[in-house]
Curated annotation (Swiss-Prot):
The keyword Nucleus does not apply. InterPro entries: ADF-H/Gelsolin-like_dom_sf, Gelsolin-like_dom, Gelsolin-like_dom_sf, Sec23, Sec23/24_helical_dom, Sec23/24_helical_dom_sf, Sec23/24_trunk_dom, Sec23_24_beta_S. This is Protein transport protein SEC23. It comes from the Eukaryota. CDD domains: Sec23-like, Sec23_C. Its main location: cytoplasm. The COPII coat is composed of at least 5 proteins: the SEC23/24 complex, the SEC13/31 complex, and the protein SAR1. Pfam families: Gelsolin (PF00626), Sec23_BS (PF08033), Sec23_helical (PF04815), Sec23_trunk (PF04811), zf-Sec23_Sec24 (PF04810). GO terms for biological process: COPII-coated vesicle cargo loading; intracellular protein transport.
Length: 773
């Protein structure tokens, strides 16, 4: 099968099951696996939207303890004996009594060969409706606060009618608004400079449950939670809308006086720990989101990231490298502990930053990364980037249910040939051991089950595997390795759901089977490797991570390219490997690994989004797409991400996922400034200017978070966004264009010391064929 038809097949599997694998044939021995260089990995999107996924209204048929795999199309079923054999633990299980009428022709939907992904609506109800707790920073400019209040009031109409909603505001103090009290505005105030233990918060808010007192009957699972003391602060939207709208409308800027040489006093840490404490008492393991709207950095109390004096700048990457950071470690520890508590309770924290300065996302990143929350970085709450991204959080399906899931858990089962080594994505380990757990660790390892808390249809997880020590005893024809993904989550309709995806792939034949190399999916592999690189970058030095990326690439090319030893000119890669080196070239230069020119908050934000997206979106982040528009062609044409693509009469459209940029070549910019597009007879020029704008609008429609939209001209300051992404094939040192040589007129000269893709490939070939890694 040629590469294009294989790619098509992988695309169909991704549409059906939400899975892309780095290798689509599994090696049958550990020795063979160790020579693959790129680990066996799956990028899995559990809630991938697919209208035809069957939703079954009954409990799944599961294997006996401790296996608990779910009946699927790969199970052998003995219709006469009413038995099914589990492919994971090989035990025989009786079919339930209501399956007595099945025949080889009439089979239940979960055994149908096309239903490798299926969803069950479980009978277990959610302990309470979904909870939304808004935590709002009042130390903001008047216009920014007004825009935020407007967005929050509007969002109440997007919530399910039974959703519980609450409000905490903070500045110098943190205030919990008692919206259940209707006589007047009433709130509980916490000092911003003091650290409160969970128990103190609960006592001060009067939340200690009566059920905790001796002699009281304990709460029975499965029954709705009694609306105890917490109902003063969290009420169903339908009841609370009037009070909450009034409280939001009356929100004023923080009244604490501030001199011109000081920052506002902001107790973000106290506000968050009060929010976590409020949900922890009454709503443990009930789906809920704490949504933080930060207009600046925390400057007092636990979790402060910078001092209140303006002459003290907020930490940069350089400060962190030199360990010149006063608050960083303490703040990081504080927020990481808060994240652990939140994840343990099954709740999610979203952070919306609306500020030109940094707000401390670097320190707070664990809050989102451990709980499956969103992280949105914008310049202000007045920007459409914030407003539209915020609305998209509440997207709904055809039945008017929120697309987001709550309180989610992912479990992975494997057949005996495979073992799970870990997961990289927004989740925490549940420390569950099973026969599927491997010896080595990649990402969050030593477990086969993870808690994600918040999950949405785009959320994707990198799951990594190894081949078991013994491997298959002896190779039999058509032997397959299998993986089953079980995702339990609270659906916004109020029931728990279980999404089951089961995949099977061939095991390779005797050593040196070419099927393994043919099964390499370079796009999935690039994304899975970039997740490992970013995971490493969080703990290792930048240069060490780049060296690791290079080393792995050289080893992969040495292993799978065709060449004669020590002859770089003989180097050839198969079609399904050719793009991989350039993905790695762009990954090395990307903002995920090169932190120069980005603030620590931006780096945390970019890495957060990369760890959330699927293969195609992640590839756009790693290697942006570039389209060119000119007079003698219809629409945009994809062009190389290269400085030679900049031409005076062309318009370029760059999509980096985070930015969408329209760049006008020198001549086009001059014509536009002269106003030709408004003159008669120049309609084709006017439509040329419009085309990239229309395409940009299409790109923005379903993108989350909303990208920044930039229109710039050749030589303009904003053009740096484009130049930094291009392969510098024409630099001030490359001759072409340096001294008016050939090509000086057309291509843009880029002033950089970065190597070009061509030089990078030459070095790669030389090292790969020399056999020294």
């Amino acid at each position: 099968m040629d590469y294009d038809s294989m790619k098509e097949q992988w695309g169909e599997v991704e549409d059906r099951d939400g899975v892309r694998l780095s290798w689509n044939v599994f090696p049958s021995t550990r020795m063979e696996a160790s020579r693959l260089v790129v680990p066996i990995g799956a990028l899995y999107t559990p809630l991938k939207e697919k209208p035809d996924t069957p939703l079954l209204q009954f409990e799944p048929v599961t294997c006996k303890q401790p296996c608990r795999s779910v009946l699927n199309p790969f199970c052998q079923v003995d219709v006469r004996a009413r038995l099914w054999i589990c492919p994971f633990c090989l035990s025989r299980n009786p079919l339930p009594p209501h399956y007595k009428d099945i025949t080889a022709q009439a089979i239940p939907p979960e055994l149908h060969p096309s239903n490798t992904t299926i969803e069950y609506r479980l009978s277990r109800p959610a302990p309470s409706p979904p909870i939304f707790l808004y935590v709002v920073d009042t130390c903001q400019e008047e216009d920014s606060l007004a825009a935020l209040k407007e967005s929050l009031i509007m969002s109440l109409s997007l919530l399910p009618e039974n959703a519980l909603v609450g409000l905490i505001t903070y500045g110098t103090m943190a205030q919990v608004h008692e919206i259940g009290y209707t006589e007047c505005a009433k709130s509980y105030v916490f000092r911003g400079s003091k650290e409160y233990a969970a128990k103190q918060v609960q006592e001060m808010l009067g939340l200690i449950q009566p059920a905790m007192r001796p002699g009281m009957p304990a709460h029975q699972p499965g029954r709705p939670m009694p609306m105890g003391p917490a109902s003063r602060f969290l009420l169903p939207v339908t009841q609370a809308e009037f009070q909450l709208t009034k409280a939001l409308e009356q929100l004023q800027q923080d009244p604490w006086p501030i001199s011109s040489d000081r920052r506002n006093l902001r107790c973000t840490g106290v506000a968050l720990s009060v929010a976590v404490g409020l949900l922890e008492t009454s709503f443990q393991n009930a789906g809920g989101r704490i949504m933080l709207f930060a207009g600046g950095p925390a400057t007092e109390g636990p979790g402060m990231v910078v001092g209140p004096e303006l002459r003290e700048p907020i930490r940069s990457h350089h400060d962190i490298d030199r360990d010149n950071v006063k608050y960083y470690k303490k703040a990081l520890k504080f927020y990481d502990n808060l994240a652990k508590r939140t994840a343990h309770n099954g709740h999610t924290i979203d952070i919306f930053a609306g500020c030109l300065d940094q707000v401390g996302l670097l320190e707070m990143k664990g809050l989102c990364n451990s709980t499956g929350g969103h992280m949105i970085l914008t310049d202000s709450f007045t920007s459409s980037m914030f407003k539209q991204s915020f609305i998209r959080v509440f997207e709904k399906d055809g039945d008017d249910n929120l697309l987001m899931g709550f309180n989610a858990v992912l479990e992975v089962l494997t057949t005996k040939e495979l073992k799970v080594t870990g997961l990289i994505g927004h989740a925490v380990s549940l420390n569950k051991k099973s026969t599927s757990v491997g010896e080595t660790e990649c990402g969050i390892g030593n477990t086969c089950s993870w808690k994600m808390c918040g999950i949405d249809p785009k959320a994707s997880y990198g799951v990594y595997f190894e081949i078991a020590q013994g491997g298959p005893s002896q190779h039999q024809q058509n032997q397959k390795g299998m993986i089953q993904f079980l995702t339990y989550y609270q659906h916004s309709s109020g029931q728990f759901h279980l999404r089951v995806t089961t995949i099977a792939r061939d095991l390779s034949g005797p050593a040196g089977d070419p099927a393994i190399a043919h099964s390499f999916d370079q796009e999935a592999a690039a994304v899975l490797m970039s997740r490992i690189a970013v995971f490493k970058a969080e703990v290792d030095d930048g240069p060490d991570v780049l060296r690791w990326v290079d080393r792995m690439l050289i080893r992969l090319c040495s292993r799978f390219a065709d060449y004669r030893k020590d002859d770089p000119s003989s180097f050839r890669l198969e079609k399904n490997f050719t793009l991989y080196p350039q993905f790695m070239f762009h990954l090395r230069r990307s903002q995920f690994l090169q932190v120069f020119n980005n603030s620590p908050d931006e780096t945390a934000f970019y890495r957060h989004v990369l760890d959330h997206e699927d293969v195609s979106n992640s590839l756009v982040m790693i290697q942006p797409t570039l389209d060119s528009y000119t007079f003698d062609q219809e629409g945009g044409q994809p062009v190389l991400l290269d400085s030679s693509s900049i031409q005076p009469t062309h318009i370029l459209l760059l999509d980096t996922f985070f930015h969408i940029l329209i760049f006008h070549g020198e001549t086009v910019a001059e014509w536009r400034k002269a106003g030709y597009q408004d003159q008669e007879g120049y309609e084709n020029f006017a439509s040329l200017l419009e085309q990239p704008k229309e395409d940009a609008r299409d790109l923005i429609t379903d993108r989350f978070p909303l990208p920044r939209f930039i229109v710039c001209d050749h030589g303009g300051s904003q053009a740096r966004f484009l130049l930094s992404k291009l392969n510098p094939s024409t630099t001030h040192t490359s001759g072409a264009g340096a001294y008016g040589g050939v090509g000086a007129q057309s291509a843009q000269t880029i002033f950089t010391d970065d190597v070009s893709l061509q030089t990078f490939m030459e070095h790669l070939m030389k090292l790969a064929v020399s056999g020294t890694n």
